């Protein structure tokens, strides 16, 4: 099993219940790692609870300022250098039975055949709803201009990426979510970009693009029957998130020299969708203003920097 040769890195913040549930989930499936590293950025009173939880599990713990990117970097810095693999997990993941075995079989197969795979992702299963943005993404104009794609895990020139959810067959992708992923240690010659802020929105997209840039291998593999669930997937509808979802994507577009015009087109559509959503939930209006300010700040950076 690959896990015995793997350093597991879990960033967490103020969620002792979910962390405990995850660790119990792994223990129940008898998944044993070479080492487990917890990087905790919780408030003082919650840190005590986290420390009490990990006493019952064989974990190392480090403390950090709140930032998913920073926390993962601390994990990378302190991992056992002999680990053949590194696995990143969000603290609220729940795995389906045999998911690790199924992923292990794919790793063994592709390494035996010397496939050029950068990383192996578990398959998130989630109920989804169609919305205005999804319909626009699939429109003819979006397809004609290459703004979006019906394929899973594609990074478009607009800076938007297609989702990776409910995959039916093993799928090669251009980016990979870092919520439940395994990388061979030999390809991890980069760090997570800490400029993505406290929440680190889109850090996984940036990390994927950077990995592809620095390595000769340029694809990731999502394993269809290696299933996990993300029960605490919260919809974020505040001003700050509306702001960073525009600014962080702009950072990626500039960093990897993607299409600025297509980025602004999709940002404008995203803004309209947020406004439309506020008709059903007035709380979305703060996110809408965040989108607007984000677009204006991007224009300012484009003109003056």
What is the role of each PLM region?
Residues 15-28:
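Short, well-formed alpha-helical segments that are part of the catalytic scaffolds
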Residues 25, 38-50, 93:
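A conserved acidic beta->alpha catalytic loop
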Residues 98-149:
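Conserved donor NDP-sugar-binding/catalytic core segment of glycosyltransferases
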Residues 70-85:
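Active-site nucleotide-sugar/metal-binding loop of Leloir-type enzymes
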Residues 150-156, 161-183:
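A recurrent flexible, glycine/aromatic-enriched loop bordering the glycosyltransferase active site
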Residues 83-94:
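Short beta-strand-to-loop acidic/aromatic patch adjacent to the donor-nucleotide binding site
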Residues 240-250, 254, 259-305:
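Non-catalytic, C-terminal membrane-associated alpha-helical segments of glycosyltransferases
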Residues 174-182, 187-190, 195-225:
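A short, conserved alpha-helix in the catalytic core of glycosyltransferases
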